[in-house]
Amino acid sequence: MAKLTKRMRVIREKVDATKQYDINEAIALLKELATAKFVESVDVAVNLGIDARKSDQNVRGATVLPHGTGRSVRVAVFTQGANAEAAKAAGAELVGMEDLADQIKKGEMNFDVVIASPDAMRVVGQLGQVLGPRGLMPNPKVGTVTPNVAEAVKNAKAGQIRYRNDKNGIIHTTIGKVDFDADKLKENLEALLVALKKAKPTQAKGVYIKKVSISTTMGAGVAVDQAGLSASVN
């Protein structure tokens, strides 16, 4: 068995794995234990009461966090004409059609989000093997295939997160940075949970949001007591 580092020993001593913490206490604990030499992200894992083997119970979507994620996001947009000008005005770093596709085929992938207008999907479709494995393929379910590319660019820049359950029915995403004010992290978490509730599949039975845990990039998960969250979540 690998020897625990001093940092991991401290984390294990501080975090009770059997306890559900009040959200304010959980955030304070994360901040106390975030001792990495960079500003760690605050990540969340939400266990959903779904059968992930059934396609009609899978949960996928996007929402804009009220306080963003703390990340600067580079956006590439496939579109043309007036939409291209609107995308540039909204802040997109890369805008084009076949020319942009050619850049990507050459391995130039200097972006975090790809957005496309419906008429551009004939071009984007050629890039499935490149964009798909990286989770960058535009999809109408998360608002990245849309006639209103300017709004999609603004959402991406404003801190939109995309979520999708894994094979175990768990959503993994980020809700900000550990140096955010505690209230902002709490409000971001609540916004995510509200979005997940709205995305609940009609076929899902029983308790839907079963467990919520937050962690930092280099830290342990801290289970959150949902009773301490706003009424809109519960």
Swiss-Prot record:
UniProt KW Ribonucleoprotein keyword: yes
Keyword entries, A-Z: Repressor, Ribonucleoprotein, Ribosomal protein, RNA-binding, rRNA-binding, Translation regulation, tRNA-binding
A GO molecular-function descriptor: rRNA binding
Xref: InterPro entries: Ribosom_uL1_bac-type (IPR005878), Ribosomal_uL1 (IPR002143), Ribosomal_uL1-like (IPR023674), Ribosomal_uL1/biogenesis (IPR028364), Ribosomal_uL1_3-a/b-sand (IPR016095), Ribosomal_uL1_CS (IPR023673)
GO biological process: regulation of translation; translation
Annotated GO CC locations: cytosolic large ribosomal subunit
Gene3D superfamilies referenced in this protein's UniProt entry, alphabetically: 3.30.190.20, 3.40.50.790
Domain of life: Bacteria
Keyword Repressor: yes
UniProt function note: Binds directly to 23S rRNA. The L1 stalk is quite mobile in the ribosome, and is involved in E site tRNA release. Protein L1 is also a translational repressor protein, it controls the translation of the L11 operon by binding to its mRNA.
Subunit structure: Part of the 50S ribosomal subunit.
Family: Belongs to the universal ribosomal protein uL1 family.
Name of the molecule in the record: Large ribosomal subunit protein uL1
Organism expressing this protein natively: Escherichia coli O127:H6 (strain E2348/69 / EPEC)
Gene name as annotated: rplA
